[in-house]
Curated annotation (Swiss-Prot):
Catalytic activity field: RNA(n) + a ribonucleoside 5'-triphosphate = RNA(n+1) + diphosphate
Gene name linked to the record: rpoB
Gene Ontology terms for molecular function: DNA binding; DNA-directed RNA polymerase activity; ribonucleoside binding
Protein name according to UniProt: DNA-directed RNA polymerase subunit beta
First-level EC class: transferase
Amino acid sequence: MFKCPERVSVKKKEDILDLPNLIEIQIKSYKQFLQIGKLAEERDNVGLEEVFREIFPIKSYNEATILEYLSYNLGVPKYSPEECIRRGITYSVTLKVRFRLTDETGIKEEEVYMGTIPIMTDKGTFIINGAERVVVSQVHRSPGINFEQEKHSKGNILFSFRIIPYRGSWLEAIFDINDLIYIHIDRKKRRRKILAMTFIRALGYSSDADIIEEFFQIEECSLKSEKDFSVLVGKILADNVLDEASSLVYGKAGEKLSTAMLKRMLDADISTLKIALEADENHPIIKMLAKDPTDSYEAALKDFYRRLRPGEPATLANARSTIMRLFFDPKRYNLGRVGRYKLNRKLGFPMDEESLSQVTLRKEDVIGALKYLIRLKMGDEKASIDDIDHLANRRVRSVGELIQNQCRSGLARMEKIVRERMNLFDFSSDTLIPGKIISAKGLTSVLKDFFGRSQLSQFMDQTNPVAELTHKRRLSALGPGGLNRERAGFEVRDVHASHYGRICPIETPEGPNIGLITSLSSFAKINEFGFIETPYRIVRDGVVTDEIEYMTADVEEECVIAQASANLDEYNMFTDPVCWARYRGEAFEADTSTVTHMDVSPKQLVSIVTGLIPFLEHDDANRALMGSNMQRQAVPLLKTEAPIVGTGLEARAAKDSGAIVVAEEDGVVEYVDGYKVVVAAKHNPTLKRTYEFKKFLRSNSGTCINQRPLCSVGDIVVKGDVIADGPATDQGELALGKNILVAFMPWYGYNFEDAVIISEKLIKQDAYTSIYIEEFELTARDTKLGKEEITRDIPNVSEEVLANLGEDGIIRIGAEVKPGDILVGKITPKSETELAPEERLLRAIFGEKAADVKDASLTVPPGTEGVVMDVKVFSRKDRLSKSDDELVEEAVHLKDLQKGYKNQISVLKTEYREKLGALLLNEKAPASIIHRRTADILVQEGTVFDQETIELLEQESLVDLLMPPCDMYDVLKNLLSDYETSLQRLEVNYKTEVEHIREGDADLDHGVIRQVKVYVASKRKLQVGDKMAGRHGNKGVVSKIVPEADMPYLANGETIQMILNPLGVPSRMNLGQVLETHLGYAAKTAGIHVKTPVFEGFPESRIWDMMIEQGLPADGKSYLYDGKTGERFDNTVVIGYIYMLKLSHLIADKIHARSIGPYSLVTQQPLGGKAQMGGQRFGEMEVWALEAYGVAHMLQEILTVKSDDVSGRTRIYESIVKGENLLKSGTPESFNVLIKEMQGLGLDVRPMVVDA
């Protein structure tokens, strides 16, 4: 069987860890959200299940009616993803939810249809209205607690903390200049400022003694004589000291003891005092006790409420319910598992499952946070402030969580409606059932809005496989709940030490989004809390083990991590006593005995696209950024070619992007053609798997998707083998460009400013030819004036224009079209107007039809030409208008379909029976199997499975079987689940086919009778003005296509294919391109492909050795001869092979001209831009140029009749038609606009006509 070609490398040893699935971030998250394939009772409390459990049960206001959620059930998709794209519909499944309603009449259960939910394709994308979209993961500030510091204008450092919940009110505490702590709620600083002591009391710590006990250690001291005074004076009391008989107070908790106070206490025979250790009068808690206006729980509650809601009556009940609602009601305040995890970790609380499930705030949290804040103030070395840009404080919301939040808001909206309906329902006249009070609109409209309009749901970049892959791995800090592009500062955008191995430091867009949109590093994963983890090898006693530990940024802080390039011996021990390592974000030379972990691979630092750049370590970071971004813009070429110099990631990137077809199981190839491959399974040759290819489909960006088989009949395939190549892949490897023989030299000035000179030979060989596919759509609707009609019979159009249209008015496949050609003929009824008498007479003589329609045909727009490659027609069938012949044909068709459906079901049942037999026959039952509804024991523990028992199990559905977890039954459950899903899918497909035969395309929008889609393919050859680039950020525009005979040539007569400017290298500092040139030349001559992975590539010495081995010049420079004169150039020139890409900025899409066109409404000046059919702006500096030449008439013409002189425009048009040559300019509209603006300011400005 075909295998990806081996690449030669100088890498000492392979990575011990394979890359994870590169689109796992998308697939895993959405799978967890929907939990497809799990039984209702087995579902975990996450995703959609969690939302339903949170919102339900819903009770009516009088609590007489209760609506409970039981479970949800997802259907199977009606169409395949490809069919959804073809029809322009959403790839989704139905959502049905089972509810139980309890009211005065009894208990009723019902399954309610709740609309449809879009589901993810195997490639990690969604299909919404026929377009593939990606939901980008969002990086946001993690819920939890953050400690910060800021400098006051007086120079004091003020410490503060914020408790940020997942949902609910923020709680902030900050020191003021007097060392008092104030609490702010919801960031409204001025109005909601509450003394921390008041807030502590409002939480339930009523007495001063309770509060002191929370913050200080208490010690009992004896007071026996005046000798004890010296020890006690200046100490702080921890409890009130009073005479119980007379209730006389000698000292209050929090007071400082003086000699006088102690004398009074001694006189009153008080012998023991409780003292707060480490407390003094300057301690923030003691200061706040003195400052606090309240002295009890009730007073504190009322004071809290007064400050929170000034103007409202502060009753105890109101105050208590407000504080409960703000922080202790799980429906309104939720820290989430993440927030609780962060808070417990920071404050040193337990990390067990029970503690992490506490989602609301606790009193202990506030006390713990205040203690930590005071420790910071006191200068405790173990207390530290948080860096908000550290990845320990930023987390990722993946697609599942983003959609879960949308579902939550949709169901919360529905909850209100359900309550209202419960209250308004008239029980006397009707019976209440769940379906009558549940409205699915809330949920479906929210999902529709999210997928269609959200900033994070994006039209997938599908220029090439890498663009697609990167889009799914993208991280965005923008979007709802994220940052704002205008307000995001430098710190947020900057590379942080904690990004190592988690976020790529190179790949980010240039421009306003720099640093806000990033990409996941190659080995990174996202854990259950949403934090990015990266793998490390564990080091024990100086030995680097093969054990892998995935670590989050905060855990990594405590580890000393060696680089992957550290030298090891054959026993995996460090050979050197010191090595480069990282600790707390700093790099230093560490003693190898202190190292705890080691990097898995040098490429774990960078993202996939950056990892595709050979010799990345020799490129300047700014150019590497451009190189990463430009690989995503490379257009798939007609003839693909893998790079001679790669990095070893090409095959993996192609595989995980979904561009190529990969074998899903072992087997033998039985049949191959251009459209499909059939593989017979190895374990059972009667089971055959068909792999269908995508043929000439249009991608989102208009490029062509086409898959070609790589195997032959009789080939043995193994799971994971490449069966077919896709767009921009070659032999299963990514192939974005071409290996081109280049020379770095100036050539007649044509490569000035990074321009590129190419040989005509590349054009002749179709080296950079790409195929673009345009889709044109036309719909015929049922209008108020009558039905539109798709027809060949179009008024006032000659027969030769209609030559390529078929009988039905649709262009034939294979027709060559150019701008203005008709693709689909359509006539539309005209609105009836009052007719002149002679017209009415003509109508009476020649019949009604001819005049009351207008031509509304679909024509080819300017700038597009090519070949019609496909036509798709969708239409509804009218049951009543079918002829008898059509009805007979339909019946035959339906009969055949039913027969095929029954055959498929019997094949499926046979397969299922065989698999059951293979698993169970003659095996002992490890545990009893019980029928869930009847509680009958179907299989007794220890029973040996025979044919009869297996047949009994075959009749049951998975929902009805209760099986204890064990290996055998887990496999049985999966078998049953797959079988039931396949049955369901067969049934849905059968019903869809029946519906299609009877009703046509019922999915068409309301009012549409017929819809036609025409696909026009055009070949784009490389031409002057196209943008080209290498992988090192070396970009340029084709400036000249030179005949092969005129290009410089080598001594052996071989002509150079492309000439680059040598001045593009030194200042750009991307030497990677020069090393690639040399290594490419040596490898091409040797006839091999090489891989030079990031940071462990070919050393320079090895490249020179290879050059000498192949008989090439040792310095990589050769003499060239001028193709025009045949003379040798004076100096030697660097020549070699570089992998060059053609980017999607093609001149054909940009070139544009206008004679007349639309004008702006206000200024009456021509619009700008190709899309608006606009003109070129003749700006201020251009006017100066004409003024300098003194061309008065041309200047007047440009500023008036060619721009915004409305009457002059019309006159000049007339004079051109009449053949006259006169220019009479009028008043430009801009003058009128100026006058109106001045009048708008209240100035009475009027133009005056003055006689000369």
